[in-house]
């Protein structure tokens, strides 16, 4: 039976698991599917319980979005903007609940989770403002007495399938862009981080009309049922290449699709670079969120003149990072890894690189005293060979390989050598090198002398195996719109 009563009206103790229920028509619904238990990766405590939505339950959520779409599409942009601002404000009041849910389910330190929640709220406010900036144009005709109008209209009900590494922020990218454009949405959060979505659903129920935003829980089968539903006009997905390829095969040929699939991101450091700044940037972007971010620096190519200084500095910085339970030590630098699979893959990549001749100069294994939590020391591998897994596969853990280079063109070629093309970084103080790197690095996002490859008001997307389509900026909003050409005859017939 549906229930309109919020499940978590007040903040809950950290030890109480969040109970998640499918959400559509602004009400919570029980599921007949087997429950999913999500445990805190730092200590094994039960963090949340969520349903495995059946195909029929998923279809009901899609029907809710479909039925709400005509009215939401007709709403004036200023009204959609106002309601999105209200949703952002409601989520801000629940920011501590959201951050706590993130840390309990995902493992990142609480202060970092608070930052993620703040970025989610910022994304909603940004798209609330963009809602009133959807413009058309008039087109002159060669025939007298005719005028063409080009309008942009929302696609329809869309699906947002989000991963576990940034379980709140990435919902904001999809929910914000879709609803600002006039689409309704069904969100499927990761089965590893369902509790975050439960808190968000309570904010949605308090602010938005029924059916505009809906949530279904489950694993890959739920995502496939959602993506393959004939009433879904577009699927926006962030996650692994393997799942992205499966979705590509699942969706109808006429269903829109955007894929953000990560990839092995490089950094290039030249002899002219500010080495201290490059070390600080590599430390942050390699180990933040325990390396579980699509734009993490996986591999660094350092010109030989500064190679030793950079590698020593990065090793020292990595060893100085605090690794701890993110609830017990909110300001820790690195928390628990989210999944055992990621934990094991990181160790495998370290072992592989060492077997091929790399040297561990920082970290290298589990953190003493924190078992059975999924904690690894931030690890730096010096002189990592090109054939080591860490230098071409995405580790998605607290690990970075470093290799020297002599010629900048060779470094750019090596940086471009991995299959993905989401983000790349460079540090140099030479103007010619800056432009050579900015133009030569074949990635959707390139950051020079900084490691913030994405900002909210500029397009964010990848190339090659990192996917296609854009989020953020006007381009992110435009991805939920379609063109309509209206040709008017206004002259005498």
Label the model's feature ranges:
Residues 26, 44, 80, 102, ...:
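Residue-level signal for inorganic ion chemistry
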Residues 37, 51, 73-74, 106, ...:
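A structural signal for short, well-ordered beta-strand elements
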Residues 136-277, 405:
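Rossmann-like NAD(P) dinucleotide-binding subdomain of oxidoreductase/dehydrogenase enzymes
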């Amino acid at each position: 039976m549906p229930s309109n009563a919020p499940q978590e009206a007040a903040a809950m103790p950290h030890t109480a698991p969040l109970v998640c229920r499918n959400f559509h028509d602004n009400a919570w619904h029980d599921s007949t599917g087997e429950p999913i238990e999500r445990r805190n990766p730092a200590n094994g405590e039960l963090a949340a319980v969520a349903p495995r939505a059946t195909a029929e339950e998923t279809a009901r959520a899609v029907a809710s979005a479909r039925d709400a779409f005509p009215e939401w599409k007709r709403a004036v942009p200023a009204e959609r903007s106002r309601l999105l601002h209200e949703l952002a404000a409601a989520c801000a009041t629940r920011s501590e609940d959201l951050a706590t849910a993130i840390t309990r389910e995902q493992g990142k330190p609480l202060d970092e989770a608070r930052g993620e929640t703040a970025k989610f709220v910022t994304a909603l406010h940004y798209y609330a403002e963009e809602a009133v900036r959807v413009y058309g144009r008039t087109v002159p005709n060669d025939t007298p007495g005719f005028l063409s109008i080009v309008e942009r209209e929302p696609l329809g009900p869309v699906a947002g399938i989000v991963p576990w590494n940034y379980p709140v922020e990435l919902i904001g990218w999809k929910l914000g862009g879709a609803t600002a454009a006039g689409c309704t949405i069904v969100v499927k959060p990761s089965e590893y981080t369902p509790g975050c979505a439960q808190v968000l659903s309570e904010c949605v129920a308090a602010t938005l009309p029924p059916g505009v935003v809906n949530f279904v829980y489950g694993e890959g089968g739920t995502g496939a049922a959602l993506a393959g539903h004939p009433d879904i006009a577009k699927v926006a997905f962030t996650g692994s290449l393997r799942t992205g390829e499966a979705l590509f095969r699942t969706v109808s040929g006429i269903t829109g699709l955007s894929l953000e699939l990560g990839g092995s991101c490089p950094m290039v450091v030249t002899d002219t670079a500010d080495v201290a700044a490059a070390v600080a940037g590599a430390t942050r972007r390699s180990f933040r969120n325990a390396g579980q971010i699509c734009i993490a620096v996986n591999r660094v190519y350092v010109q030989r003149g500064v190679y030793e200084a950079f590698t020593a500095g990065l090793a020292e910085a990595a060893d100085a990072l605090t690794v701890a339970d993110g609830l017990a030590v909110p300001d820790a630098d690195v928390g628990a890894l989210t999944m055992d699979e990621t934990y094991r893959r990181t160790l495998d990549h370290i072992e592989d690189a060492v077997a091929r001749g790399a040297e561990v100069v920082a970290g290298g294994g589990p953190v003493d005293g924190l078992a059975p939590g999924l904690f690894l020391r931030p690890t730096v591998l010096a002189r990592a060979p090109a054939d080591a897994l860490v230098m071409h596969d995405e580790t998605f853990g607290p690990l970075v390989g470093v290799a020297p280079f002599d010629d900048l063109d060779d470094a750019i070629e090596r940086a471009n050598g991995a299959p993905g093309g989401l983000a790349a970084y460079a540090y140099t103080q030479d103007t010619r090198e800056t432009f050579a790197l900015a133009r030569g690095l074949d990635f959707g996002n390139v950051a020079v002398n900084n490691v913030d490859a994405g900002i909210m008001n500029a397009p964010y997307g990848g190339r090659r195996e990192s996917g296609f389509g854009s989020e953020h900026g006007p381009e992110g909003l435009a991805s939920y719109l379609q063109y309509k050409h209206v040709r008017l005859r206004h002259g005498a017939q």
